[in-house]
């Protein structure tokens, strides 16, 4: 199996981060609809479960990495009363433009801001945030370990990193059902609805290539987190990871 850094959306010589930026700029207008469709609406439930895991920490400032169209940032402001400010960073301007529209419609523009930044080189001082989150974005990092190191760096002592990611089921029969769905349904429907043949072939490939469960928890520990654990959701097709600095 190829390393996640080798799995890219397009067959070009461009670095992965540039390809990911181009892909999300291209599919931005379809992203939310397809995200809800392919997860059967469960992506909303997964976000809410993930948010509940950081709520006890009562963060005031949150960094949402790979914020996309801002769904997680908005849900954080809705459901965690202690949060004063969420900073969303992403490579894709088109995704964040949609996010800005959603934030304005929710009257949250005084609590959520967006910045186009690479998660591997965050423009923040050490110990800047009470929590860091990333939903459905870790597998797109050009270097997952470096991304974890950067998120660790900007966290305050004792603060949580929460990662929500898609995952490969390992139990019968969910594994077999997922493999068919990921290999045959997602690429065909995604190609038809998004007009991007590569983007929704890349999706299951990137999920398959990234470290998962114990492997990712161990990687989190290796970059400095004093505690790392995970919780499987919805027949193992999604996983929430928590790391404590």
From Swiss-Prot:
CDD domains: AdoMet_MTases. Keywords: Menaquinone biosynthesis, Methyltransferase, S-adenosyl-L-methionine, Transferase. Its EC number is 2.1.1.163. GO terms for molecular function: demethylmenaquinone methyltransferase activity. GO terms for biological process: menaquinone biosynthetic process; methylation. HAMAP family: MenG_UbiE_methyltr (MF_01813). Belongs to the class I-like SAM-binding methyltransferase superfamily. MenG/UbiE family. This is Demethylmenaquinone methyltransferase. It comes from Porphyromonas gingivalis (strain ATCC 33277 / DSM 20709 / CIP 103683 / JCM 12257 / NCTC 11834 / 2561). The gene is menG.
């Amino acid at each position: 199996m190829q390393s996640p850094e080798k799995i890219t959306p397009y067959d070009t010589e461009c670095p992965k981060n540039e390809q990911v930026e181009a892909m999300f700029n291209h599919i931005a207008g379809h992203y939310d609809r397809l995200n809800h469709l392919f997860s059967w609406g469960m992506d909303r439930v997964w976000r809410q479960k993930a948010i509940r895991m950081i709520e006890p920490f009562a963060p005031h400032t949150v960094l949402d990495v790979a914020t996309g169209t801002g769904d997680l940032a908005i849900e954080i402001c809705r459901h965690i009363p202690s949060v004063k400010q969420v900073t969303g960073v992403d490579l894709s301007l088109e995704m964040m433009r949609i996010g800005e529209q959603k934030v304005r419609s929710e009257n949250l523009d005084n609590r959520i801001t967006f910045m186009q930044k690479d998660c591997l080189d965050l423009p923040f001082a050490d110990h800047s945030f009470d929590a860091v989150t990333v939903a459905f974005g870790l597998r797109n990092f050009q270097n997952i370990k470096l991304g974890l190191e950067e998120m660790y760096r900007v966290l305050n002592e004792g603060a949580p990193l929460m990662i929500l990611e898609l995952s490969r089921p390992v139990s019968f029969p969910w594994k077999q059902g997922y493999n068919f769905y990921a290999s045959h349904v997602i690429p065909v429907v995604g190609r038809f609805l998004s007009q991007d043949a590569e983007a929704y072939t890349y999706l299951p490939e990137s999920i398959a290539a990234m470290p998962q469960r114990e492997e990712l928890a161990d990687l989190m520990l290796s970059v400095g987190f004093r505690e790392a654990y995970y919780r499987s959701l919805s027949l193992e097709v999604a996983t929430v990871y928590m790391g404590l600095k």
